[in-house]
Amino acid sequence: LKQFDELGPSGEFLMEFSIYDAIQSGFNHLVLITRKENKDFLFNYLRERINSSIKIDVVIQETTNLPIGMTANPKREKPWGTAHAVWCAKDFISDDFAIINADDYYGYNAFKNAANFFNSSTDENNYGLVSYKLKDTLSDFGSVSRGVCKVSNDKLSSINEHLKIERTDGIIKDFDSGNILDEDDYVSMNFWLCRSNFFNYLDSYIEKTMNELENIEKDEIYLPFAAQQLLEDNIISIEVVDSNSGWFGVTYAEDKKESVKKLREFSQSIYPIPLWKG
């Protein structure tokens, strides 16, 4: 798994830098959603590194774990997708919470701004999305898939998925549609800021969507689609929070070398070496 690639100067996983930044920003509870075979390793690995004041839970995403009244399909082996993964954490979270990918680097400012969002707003139907400029999320080694945000008065109106974005000759283009995209457009990198009531919404969304899947053995239930449905139904509003940060990830094998280089540079100025000193 690329989530367990040792990219940091002392062999750290990429997710460890996000965890470190989140803790520095005031987050005090870590919930990881993973496969059964990774549970013990992840918990033990992080528990021995992270201060005991930080609560750690590791949750297994199981295909048989479904909303009450739903029956698991015995033929289903593939995980149900990101919306279901988050729903699986429902018994471990009772407060507002942030969601991130384990294999992305988001930057300290992104977590600081996420914490500020929660500290400044308690409206249970005002959610957030920490967003990045499109130009800062491209790969030098091939096309990327991005959800481009339509924003009005700092609120998210919609997210449009573009599956083949690439910069050529200084122009950013969606090669599926042929459309030229603005490099300063905000995009979603799945850094969501949610309220505890999100699990209630996910209950009904998962049930409805699962009943509409064309291929019950392979199709997935995606977190951005769940958020967008709530937005379209006027159940929630989603504030677009500027990350004020750079992003990077490992989309292609060639990205790995660049990620190692960036983490080494950051560790000379931002992070301690090793990351979890003492």
Tell where the protein language model's regions lie, with residue ranges.
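A C-terminal functional module that forms or caps the active site or interfaces directly
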Residues: 203-235
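Short, surface-exposed amphipathic charged segments that create phosphate/polyanion-binding patches used
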Residues: 68-79, 142-147, 254-258
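N-terminal glycine-rich phosphate-binding loop and ensuing alpha1 helix
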Residues: 1-47, 54-56, 61, 95
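Short phosphate-binding loop-to-helix
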Residues: 50-96
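Conserved core of the sugar-phosphate nucleotidyltransferase
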Residues: 108-192, 196
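Short beta-strand-to-loop acidic/aromatic patch adjacent to the donor-nucleotide binding site
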Residues: 94-105
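Hydrophobic helical membrane-anchoring modules
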Residues: 234-237, 244-278
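Phosphate- and divalent-cation-binding pockets in alpha/beta enzyme and binding domains
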Residues: 41-42, 109, 201, 226, ...
